[in-house]
Structure formats: C-alpha cells, structure tokens
Amino acid sequence: MSASLDDASVAPLVRKTAAWAWRFLVILAAMVALLWVLNKFEVIVVPVLLALMLSALLVPPVDWLDSRGLPHAVAVTLVLLSGFAVLGGILTFVVSQFIAGLPHLVTEVERSIDSARRWLIEGPAHLRGEQIDNAGNAAIEALRNNQAKLTSGALSTAATITELVTAAVLVLFTLIFFLYGGRSIWQYVTKAFPASVRDRVRAAGRAGYASLIGYARATFLVALTDAAGVGAGLAVMGVPLALPLASLVFFGAFIPLIGAVVAGFLAVVVALLAKGIGYALITVGLLIAVNQLEAHLLQPLVMGRAVSIHPLAVVLAIAAGGVLAGVVGALLAVPTVAFFNNAVQVLLGGNPFADVADVSSDHLTEV
C-alpha cells in the first residue's frame, strides 16, 4: 500500500526522468568498462584495428584479382608483396632524397642564421655580437644540463621502437588472415549472437566494413592529392627536402582535417629557415589552398554516401581518439565512427540488407 502511495505521490515527469537516468548510467558504466578493457589490451587492440583498416584498403585489389580467375591465396600473396614493394620503394626513395637534400638544407639554415644575426646587430634592435653569442652559449648550456633527460628519452625511444616492431608483426599476421579468410572469421564471431538477430548483425558488419572500404579508398586518394599539391609547390619554390615533406603530408592526411595541416607546418618551418619569410608565407597559402580543395571538392566527391559523417562528429571523434590513445587514436577515430554509423543504421533498420544492397558484394566477402 505504501509503495503504491509513494508511486502515486511522484510526478510522472520525475518517474520518467529517473527511469531514463538509471538506464543512461548503466550505458555509461558499460562504455567506461569497455574503454578500460580496451586500454588494458591496447597492445593487441590497436594492431588488430590497423590491420582491419589496411584490409579495407587492400580488399578491392584482391577482389579484382579474384574476379580475373586468380586463386584467392595467390591474389592475397600478390597484393601483399606488391604493397610491400611499393611501400619499400617509396621509403627508400624518400630517405635517399632526405640524405641528399640535408646538406643543402644545413647550408641554407646557416645562411639564414647569419642573416638573422646581421639583422639583430645592424637592424632596429642594435644588439651587440657579445649578447648574441651569450644567448647561444646559454642555449648550449641548457642542452648540456638536460643531457640526462635527453639520454633517458633516447632509451625510451629505443623501447618504443621495439614495441613498434612487435606491433608491426602482429598487424601483418592479422592482415594476412583478414584478407584470406575475413568472411569466415566474421561468420564465426557472429555465432555468439542469438539466431533471431544473427543475420542482422552480419549485415551490420558488412555495412560497416563497406564504409571502411569507402573511407580507406577516399582517404588514400585525398592524401595522395594533398602530397602531390604540396610537393609540387615546394619543388617549384626550391624549398629543400620537398619530397620528404610531401611524404609527411601524405601520411598526415590520414588524420582528417588536421593531419595534413600539422604535417604541413613542418614544411612552413623549413621554408622559413631555408628561403625566408616570404616563401614561408607562400607555403602557408599553398597549404590553405590544398586544404580548401580537399574539404570542398575531394572529400565530398570521393567519399560520397559511404562515409556520411558530420564535420562536427569528425572533429569530436579525432579529439576523443587523441585524448584516449594519442596519434593512433586520432588516426582510428574517424573510421571507427564511420563503421558504427553504418552498422547501427542497419541494426536499427527494418531490412538488414537494404543499406548494403548498393555495395558490391565482392567488396564484402572479406567480412
């Protein structure tokens, strides 16, 4: 009796708010627990996600070779070997260009330092040479005083390299299995779901993976265009290390909106040191032009409906990923959102296969 009286005394709005509140708290607690588990197994989760992203980029050529009658194992092997050959060739060429262009950059930097020193002495500042030398000596002394920290940083870098090598091996191992038997793996994983929803979950996975394929293809084309534009501009201006800087822009462009800009900042610094403030400002204008071309033409054209994410969601996802997992988190944030955006739409839809009907079934056979 008292319970019913108590319920009757509570306003309906309060009861509904309380019901939603405890459900929200349960969902929030589950998300926190999931993030905690992912953080504990980061050394496994991150390589698996990277392998999934790489598989989305490599599945289309594997499917193309399959459609030409090549055995699946041969197609996977050929695509992987071709990818390694292209990546190794690019890295070798970039490193050789960096080594060849470094002396010229050092010469230009020394010339810029001499020009700045003359300006500080002869310009409005009217500094004495002794003052500038003392400032340089103070900087050298500060480096010596922090030598222990720099040494420990080098040791931690060595440990990081070991972790990176281990992660790279795990990525390669996982990637091979995703390319060779991704569909079987996904079919096996979905057996954990009840039979009544199993088909819908499988369709959601296919839709999410289709968005990953679209995202990987579009991001690769955008990154290639950004790198070509920036590299060509730097080469025309005669900025040293144009090709290595363009390569940094290419890899940075895989983090949407901010990656290419952050990588391009280094190009601005090199242009400033090597060619002066005028060329640095031109480089800034070049980066802005490339960024506008990417935002208003390339991304809407090449991504299309496969990755329809609001720009605010992209920014928030990158920020959250960066806070949770650093650069890797920022790299994986947007494709993760793209995956769940399509997958959830299919899970909530009436026909689990409607949203993936327009995607080539060949591209989905690896999920």
UniProtKB/Swiss-Prot annotation:
InterPro entries: AI-2E-like. One of its GO terms (biological process) is transmembrane transport. Disulfide bonds: none annotated. Keywords: Cell membrane, Membrane, Transmembrane, Transmembrane helix, Transport. The chain crosses the membrane at residues 18-38, 41-61, 74-94, 161-181, 228-248, 249-269, 270-290, 314-334, 337-357. Its main location: membrane. Belongs to the autoinducer-2 exporter (AI-2E) (TC 2.A.86) family. This is Putative transport protein MT0215.
